[in-house]
């Protein structure tokens, strides 16, 4: 079992390993090019989510049809995508931006899944990164050779 499962997911393996594999000669140029194109599309969709504001008239019909509270003023898309019942696809349709995002390939299922997961689990992922950084600091801590372990009562 992996200690940091939220970071070591199957759906982000290519993001974690393709660059390393390419530098070791294990990933072909074609595969690396496809990966870079995917990352460009992911970046475009990520920027769309971060820069888009959703107006009440765009999202409220959907929220009300689900029995959820409507919004009263424009809200950043990042806040809406955080709701468990709202998918990125629903958000794009509500914002009426599908055609523009389709044109750049940002609505491919794999791209959508990657970015939706990134935003829905952002808080958990950030906490996990913080834990990893804390563990790295602890690993660098040097225990003095003169320490008397038998005098430590909690061991």
State the predicted function of each range.
Residues 1-3, 7-155:
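Extended, charge-enriched "interface" segments that sit outside catalytic cores
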């Amino acid at each position: 079992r992996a200690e940091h499962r939220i970071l070591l997911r199957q759906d982000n393996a290519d993001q974690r390993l393709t660059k390393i594999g390419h530098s070791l000669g294990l990933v072909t140029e074609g595969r690396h090019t496809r990966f870079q194109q995917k990352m460009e599309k992911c970046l475009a969709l990520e920027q769309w989510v971060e820069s888009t504001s959703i107006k009440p008239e765009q999202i409220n019909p959907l929220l009300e049809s689900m029995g959820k509270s409507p919004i009263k003023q424009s809200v950043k898309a990042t806040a809406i995508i955080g709701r468990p019942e709202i998918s990125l696809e629903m958000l794009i349709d509500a914002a009426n931006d599908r055609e523009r995002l389709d044109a750049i390939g940002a609505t491919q299922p794999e791209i959508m899944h990657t970015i939706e997961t990134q935003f829905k689990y952002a808080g958990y992922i950030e906490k996990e990164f913080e834990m990893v950084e804390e563990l790295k600091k602890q690993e660098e801590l040097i225990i003095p050779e003169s320490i008397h372990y038998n005098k430590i009562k909690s061991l």
